[in-house]
């Protein structure tokens, strides 16, 4: 099974704290290289529309070249690892747990270009990333009974999420939630079960209206949104063809403190009322008109290329976590 996601991000960051004295002879483990990499990773996490925050794993290459006038171009090749924090989770990525290998880890390789003005400290950031999970063969070789990653669109995954959400809504008098995104699904063994992770938001519908396909529910007005991230296990066989009805399940939902104006507040409107499974697998995601305000609707420039990122001394840098 092979999953591919491409993120194409373009935006502006103003007020950089980086020194105006930009070194051009950086090695991948230099402190300044780490600062540039952190800028790119921070931008990815602030504008990523789906799934999980990413953490830096390896700086594979860095090249700093003079551009026009006061501009300096920084080209980076980065390897990132998926964390367990959803993009809506306000937890700083530095405090997020890296998804362990036995839980079917996912890596992301990114080409980044940062245009830095040494006079104004203004930055333009361009990033293109491809995400790939560890192979099923490697997971099973190292841990034969570990859960295997499934597509968020897998019928068992979708049915499990809907089943757990319906059970929660039945128990919450006066509150109705809808799925914002199905972020992860896994097939577990001994006992056989389906493990799912998904984000939900409180809507302004009654329980009856929520089950009416002709009624469109909307998130509560600003300041009243209850957003939660849920992890659940539904115990059922992969051979089951019917939707779950009376299966045993375990679940835990944590309310996320997403403030109005938070960098990801746009995600609610991006997801609600649309197909709620993550498009991150077997798909390409590009910035379009509905992207966050910081995005510009144009393609990433062609000068993020190998000719700017030929191997340099001291690269790649050290592996901060593990290599897939």
From Swiss-Prot:
Entry-linked PROSITE patterns: CYSTATIN_FETUIN_A, FETUIN_1, FETUIN_2
CDD domains the UniProt entry points to: CY (cd00042)
Disulfide bonds, paired cysteine numbers: 28-315, 85-96, 110-129, 143-146, 205-217, 230-253, 287-291
Localization of this protein: Secreted
Annotated glycosylation sites: 204, 282
Domain Cystatin fetuin-A-type: 22-130, 141-254
Tissues expressing the protein: Expressed by the liver.
Motif Cell attachment site location, chain numbering: 23-25
Signal peptide: 1-19
InterPro entries according to UniProt: Cystatin_dom, Cystatin_Fetuin_A, Cystatin_sf, Kininogen_Fetuin_HRG, Prot_inh_fetuin_CS
Recorded superkingdom: Eukaryota
Broad class of the protein's primary localization: secreted
GO molecular function: cysteine-type endopeptidase inhibitor activity
Annotated Gene Ontology cellular component terms: blood microparticle; extracellular matrix
PANTHER family linked: ALPHA-2-HS-GLYCOPROTEIN, FETUIN
Subunit description: Homodimer.
Protein name, as recorded: Antihemorrhagic factor jMSF
């Amino acid at each position: 099974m092979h999953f591919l996601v491409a993120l194409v991000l373009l935006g502006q960051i103003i007020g950089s704290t980086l020194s105006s004295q930009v070194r051009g002879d950086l090695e991948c483990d230099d402190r300044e290289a780490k600062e540039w990499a952190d800028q790119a990773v921070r931008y990815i996490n602030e504008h990523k529309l789906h799934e999980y925050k990413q953490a830096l794993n390896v700086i594979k290459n860095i090249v700093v070249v003079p551009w026009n006038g006061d501009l300096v171009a920084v080209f980076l090749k980065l390897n990132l690892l998926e964390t367990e924090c959803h993009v809506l989770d306000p937890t700083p990525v530095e405090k997020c747990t890296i998804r362990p290998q036995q839980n079917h880890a996912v890596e992301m390789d990114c080409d980044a270009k940062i245009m830095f003005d040494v006079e104004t400290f203004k930055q333009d950031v361009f990033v293109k990333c491809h995400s790939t999970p560890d192979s099923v063969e490697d997971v099973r070789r190292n841990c034969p009974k570990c859960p295997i990653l499934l597509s968020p669109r897998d019928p068992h995954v979708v049915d499990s999420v809907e089943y757990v959400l319906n059970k929660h809504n039945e128990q919450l008098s006066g509150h109705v939630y809808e799925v914002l995104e199905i972020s992860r699904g896994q097939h577990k063994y001994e006992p056989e079960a389906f493990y799912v992770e998904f984000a939900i938001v409180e809507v302004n519908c009654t329980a009856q209206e929520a089950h009416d396909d002709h009624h469109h529910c909307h998130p509560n007005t600003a300041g009243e949104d209850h957003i939660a991230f849920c992890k659940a296990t539904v115990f059922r066989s992969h051979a089951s063809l019917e939707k779950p009805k009376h299966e045993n399940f375990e679940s835990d939902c944590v309310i996320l403190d997403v403030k109005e104006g938070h960098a990801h507040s746009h995600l609610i409107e991006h997801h609600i009322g649309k197909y709620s499974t993550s498009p991150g697998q077997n798909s390409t995601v590009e910035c379009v008109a509905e992207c966050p305000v910081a995005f510009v609707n144009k393609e990433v420039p062609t000068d993020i290329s190998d000719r700017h990122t030929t191997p340099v001394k001291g690269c790649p840098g050290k592996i901060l976590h593990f290599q897939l």
